[in-house]
Amino acid sequence: MTLPFGASEIWYAFAFASPSRPRIELYFGSPDADRNESAFKVFEMRRQALEAGFGEPLDFQPLEGKKASRIVAWGPTTHTIMDPAQHPQVAGWFIETMARFRQVTQAFKSATAHQPTAAPLASEGI
């Protein structure tokens, strides 16, 4: 499932890397690899602020050899989609984590329109 970021070529996704590996991600999916790389670098340059605001490490994945890139927050491996009894826990993790992830990444949304070498903006507030 995807949600809009506010730029047509960047979006949020709820996904599973395997049945017991939930993740949320900010996906940079323009058909133009250079645009993805530039937007990804805006966030990568602000990694410390993003992780501090989010409250845990994030996995920055440039996806070498592909056009796209993504930033991932991994869920606990104890949550599995295969066990219906765990569905409420999995859904709760997705909702709570996406709320935090979205809040911290939205603070940097305006920076994606700036040059990727720009210093962090004082208005970013993180």
PLM feature spans:
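Polyanion-binding interface signature
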Residues: 1-78
